[in-house]
Amino acid sequence: MTIPEKPQGVIWTDAQWQSIYATGQDVLVAAAAGSGKTAVLVERIIQKILRDGIDVDRLLVVTFTNLSAREMKHRVDQRIQEASIADPANAHLKNQRIKIHQAQISTLHSFCLKLIQQHYDVLNIDPNFRTSSEAENILLLEQTIDEVIEQHYDILDPAFIELTEQLSSDRSDDQFRMIIKQLYFFSVANPNPTNWLDQLVTPYEEEAQQAQLIQILTDLSKVFITAAYDALNKAYDLFSMMDGVDKHLAVIEDERRLMGRVLEGGFIDIPYLTGHEFGARLPNITAKIKEANEMMVDALKDAKLQYKKYKSLIDKVKSDYFSREADDLKADMQQLAPRVKYLARIVKDVMSEFNRKKRSKNILDFSDYEHFALQILTNEDGSPSEIAESYRQHFQEILVDEYQDTNRVQEKILSCIKTGDEHNGNLFMVGDVKQSIYKFRQADPSLFIEKYQRFTIDGDGTGRRMDLSQNFRSRKEVLSTTNYIFKHMMDEQVGEVNYDESAQLYYGAPYDESDHPVNLKVLIEADQEHSDLTGSEQEAHFIVEQVKDILEHQKVYDMKTRSYRSATYKDIVILERSFGQARNLQQAFKNEDIPFHVNSREGYFEQTEVRLALSFLRAIDNPLQDIYLVGLMRSVIYQFKEDELAQIRILSPNDDYFYQSIVNYINDEAADAILVDKLKMFLSDIQSYQQYSKDHPVYQLIDKFYNDHYVIQYFSGLIGGRGRRANLYGLFNKAIEFENSSFRGLYQFIRFIDELIERGKDFGEENVVGPNDNVVRMMTIHSSKGLEFPFVIYSGLSKDFNKRDLKQPVILNQQFGLGMDYFDVDKEMAFPSLASVAYRAVAEKELVSEEMRLVYVALTRAKEQLYLIGRVKNDKSLLELEQLSISGEHIAVNERLTSPNPFHLIYSILSKHQSASIPDDLKFEKDIAQVEDSSRPNVNISIIYFEDVSTETILDNDEYRSVNQLETMQNGNEDVKAQIKHQLDYQYPYVNDTKKPSKQSVSELKRQYETEESGTSYERVRQYRIGFSTYERPKFLSEQGKRKANEIGTLMHTVMQHLPFKKERISEVELHQYIDGLIDKHIIEADAKKDIRMDEIMTFINSELYSIIAEAEQVYRELPFVVNQALVDQLPQGDEDVSIIQGMIDLIFVKDGVHYFVDYKTDAFNRRRGMTDEEIGTQLKNKYKIQMKYYQNTLQTILNKEVKGYLYFFKFGTLQL
């Protein structure tokens, strides 16, 4: 069917129009970010219904997520309703209103499930099957692996013994089990898992495949060797500019001869490379050269730098790719073959037994969905079954969204139900391989790439390819800068895609013509002398400053009204690779009172509160695990100090487990009695929880732990309290889900959690903030995919790529299989094998490529403005990045492959055209004006030193404040002196009014009202004169002797004023240390200690009120205030006979948005015979009712917020008002 002619005035671009109507062959639409992909997909579905008369239930629409499926179905339904209203007599449209509910617009998993439900008889399974929970599936697989390994231990095949010696330690086979699980998940992502496993051994047995691996390494080596040769030649050229360096030139000449031999004939001579030494040491530099002119000194530095680069590149090739002779590598492969074959056998046994267990329980998992669907749709020979043919007849078109995230099993399923070949098929695919960022979920971007390269624009003889390149989301500055970065960063070699004219973004949004350049901010860290903050904390602080700047100066353009509005919090998103920076950002935003939310369902198990709960569970399950036992002891729950742990271990240094050391310490007569009591209480708790766990489900054990130690309350009061609370509840809810499976017990639950951690699965914070809440958001790049924001701050650019998987002894790859290091069992030594070296190199290339795609996703989220935040320790590293080598239009391949982080690439690309000091051979273009508008960068690069812009509040960690900490004024500033003298000599013009007493204390008002309420006929005193008596130095600060009750009261208040609230209860020993600190600071006299009522303070420390204050979000001590009494009493503002109230509140704290005040009382009271505590409490409340009411009203007047209060009596306890 031909594409209809596009009418004038339609909203669709030519490419979109063709994507909507193209038919008659398989179609692949490469839809760049912001190009309207979803709108095109919906319109294509609608036109199939309206124009072609196809029923909606005869289309199969496959989406990546259930949410996308629901949104897609809703959009289609809305369009059908609109069309039906416009044409009410259309019977076809009325029919679609009914059929939309049966329409197959879903994820592929949902389609597979429906297929199984309809054809379960083919599979010979019970139709009453259910889908296993995540907990049940994980634990069942763990159990299966355990049983299969145990069976093979009984067999003790020599290959199995070698495997266990290579992949297990003397204490654990965890690594061995992990590799089995990884191989299982890799295998089931293939249409025929057994066949994939059988082929793992092929490279180890067949020389032809080994030759292919050698070629992979040779090709990679050529990249680095060529770069090394270039660096060597540059070093030679630079040394040639100098005098007195003949010896240096001779050394380099020798190196050039060696390198010429390696590169002879355009091929890499690997035997020659591995058989010779390279990188001879250069002679020492003479003083004459060092003292030459500045240009020569710079040339010398550059020459040495280039020679050093040459050596490092050669070393990389020899150490990473060819550390051993090729023949030795091949010999190792032959010895590894039996181990690889046996490992595949174990995985097949696991697969078979796992499937048997699932069938016995009548459960299916998501992998079963796909493989059972394939079983239904294919015959034994792999050809489509009769059922597949019936689906081919039924579905008139198959539409696949996010095709770049498809795996090979899903591709096979689609091929079974589509009609025709590529040149006459009915498969419509939409996606963007530049946004393929789910390789960890076994997504295979090569499926998209292969089709994109095979399909043509006109579709002659094959499928048809279309490019949606016009972006309707972002300003042109964002697009052109993004294009410039990727034009020089991404190609087929690194990135897997050529970022050419068809791949780049073209401006299509109707913004105004104002200039909004991209901002690359490079933060130079302050060292410890200039800031107490870590580098990450400095970056978080700097990000907050950027947010404040956006809110103050930036506007958001409304395309519909063509007008601007002020930026709000929700317009701003902070994107990072992971959530490692979340807590620092939360603290930084909290310090500035900016609403901030971490949109996190990742990084869950890294959170402090979750680690504490898991340490508790692990210690209860097995207290012989030192890491978790000690972690629990050091936590806020038990508060053991490092020196206490040291005392315990020193007494029994040879114990295998710390638990043994604890028991031995308790039983030692020389042990510290206080520490022994603390340890006994700790062990008593452990044993009590262990007993409880035997008779109660895990979720009840977690709940008891939370309640016993106020865990929820404590973490709710910290930074990010809502999220922390959600995390703790998330663990509790997961335990409930676990109990609903067929597994029970603490041990099994911990295994379930360990499996989630290992697989990178998260179930973290609940969504405590809605999409329309006005807060600044932080999210990962993965979670931002598909979203857009006016202002994007892409930070964490300097955080290195996570290459942890590359260091494993076994490397897995969907295309190549398994690369296992060689392990010499006799010598107990491991060496890289040919397969592990080659697959590791391939994996590193794929990792860097995916990281590039993550950068692309991050940059293309921005609508109005994009901020890139990098951080370095010093500016010297920037010069090295500016001089990064290039090759043609790209950063050199070797530089890209070894780039440690995104900043390394982004800065080196964007800085080249802005630096005048960079030679032409290191620039992409001599004149940036020559670059086309669509890829000409519009970027401001700012180098910022943190100490120059920091407005951080320097917090004194000292708990104490001394009365004599005064600053001295420096001499020499006469203007300042004159200003101060003028202020001191100033005569107040209304001096007579000062004789009118107008200031009253809250305590005085209390006495006045007590007089009035007692019935005294005295007229209310409106003027209370504060006497002119000299204030004496308190006796507890001066003379020794017996103190009066009021002096002791003042002393107690002083102690309480400085009492630390460290979110934990301090011990009596720590209290004495704290009092001694007050004495050392001269806040109280040494002899005052005997009059401090330690028992009463300890009672307060152990009270609930102390715990509440410790968990507060903010705490203020000894807060003075002065307020107009008219406001407090709600008197008319014109009343001139109104006084000013002044007072001092002992303590204020903020918890859950509510302000509380605390007033300490040292009063004694009369307990009449028979009086209950409740009656005494009422009496005390009444006594201070007036004063407390004024405190409450005053604070509410000042803060304009709800205020509550507490009275604390040292001789009675807490009273809440």
Swiss-Prot record:
Heterodimer of AddA and AddB/RexB. The heterodimer acts as both an ATP-dependent DNA helicase and an ATP-dependent, dual-direction single-stranded exonuclease. Recognizes the chi site generating a DNA molecule suitable for the initiation of homologous recombination. The AddA nuclease domain is required for chi fragment generation; this subunit has the helicase and 3' -> 5' nuclease activities. Belongs to the helicase family. AddA subfamily. Residues 491-786 form the UvrD-like helicase C-terminal domain. Keywords: ATP-binding, DNA damage, DNA repair, DNA-binding, Exonuclease, Helicase, Hydrolase, Isomerase, Nuclease, Nucleotide-binding. Gene3D superfamilies: 3.90.320.10, P-loop containing nucleotide triphosphate hydrolases, PCRA, domain 4. It comes from the Bacteria. GO terms for cellular component: cytosol; DNA helicase complex. This is ATP-dependent helicase/nuclease subunit A. Its cofactor is Mg(2+). It catalyses: Couples ATP hydrolysis with the unwinding of duplex DNA by translocating in the 3'-5' direction; ATP + H2O = ADP + phosphate + H(+). CDD domains: DEXQc_UvrD. ATP binds at A31, A32, A33, G34, S35, G36, K37, T38. Its EC number is 3.1.-.-, 5.6.2.4. Coiled coil: none annotated. GO terms for biological process: double-strand break repair via homologous recombination. GO terms for molecular function: 3'-5' DNA helicase activity; 3'-5' exonuclease activity; ATP binding; ATP hydrolysis activity; double-stranded DNA binding. Residues 10-475 form the UvrD-like helicase ATP-binding domain. InterPro entries: AddA (IPR014152), DNA_helicase_UvrD-like_C (IPR014017), DNA_helicase_UvrD/REP (IPR000212), P-loop_NTPase (IPR027417), PDDEXK-like_dom_sf (IPR011604), PDDEXK_AddAB-type (IPR038726), Restrct_endonuc-II-like (IPR011335), UvrD-like_ATP-bd (IPR014016).
